Amino acid sequence: MAKKPVKDLKQLGHATPVPASPEEATLERVPNPHPDANYVARFTVPEFTSLCPVTGQPDFAHLVIDYVPGKWLIESKSLKLYLQSFRNHGAFHEDCTLAIGKRLAGTLAPKWLRIGGYWYPRGGIPIDVFWQKGKLPAGVWVPDQGVAPYRGRG
């Protein structure tokens, strides 16, 4: 891949503080070197954190983001910083999960994208949130997200 796209990045290779909020975070993208191929790129985030908008208590989730790129790939440092910006952000589980999926879809215009948000129990109830954009191209292999259903002590 050409070096020019890397040169244009503002976060990769630079000391970059965690943004104060998801709205302030910058998601960067790079050209997909294989836009003609249908393949899945996966990001697994086992320690995602946000805040309950009512109590201010921390909420934790295991996120799995799968997408079939079009012309663009997400630059992973910018994704990491974006996700870390939720650490002090108050929002319900559904809002966090869909906000991430929609922001990625808007930035990348992928052929297909899905996000699974597997939220750890609060008040004894785990909440799993799933969102998908687009139709999966034929013939693309997408592995199971690999997150076991919550069983507690049952």
From Swiss-Prot:
EC number: 1.7.1.13
Main location: cytoplasm
Spans annotated as Disordered: 1-31
Pathway where it operates: tRNA modification; tRNA-queuosine biosynthesis
Record's keyword annotation contains Nucleotide-binding: no
Top-rank taxon, per record: Bacteria
Family to which the UniProt record says this protein belongs: Belongs to the GTP cyclohydrolase I family. QueF type 1 subfamily.
Protein name: NADPH-dependent 7-cyano-7-deazaguanine reductase
Species of provenance: Parvibaculum lavamentivorans (strain DS-1 / DSM 13023 / NCIMB 13966)
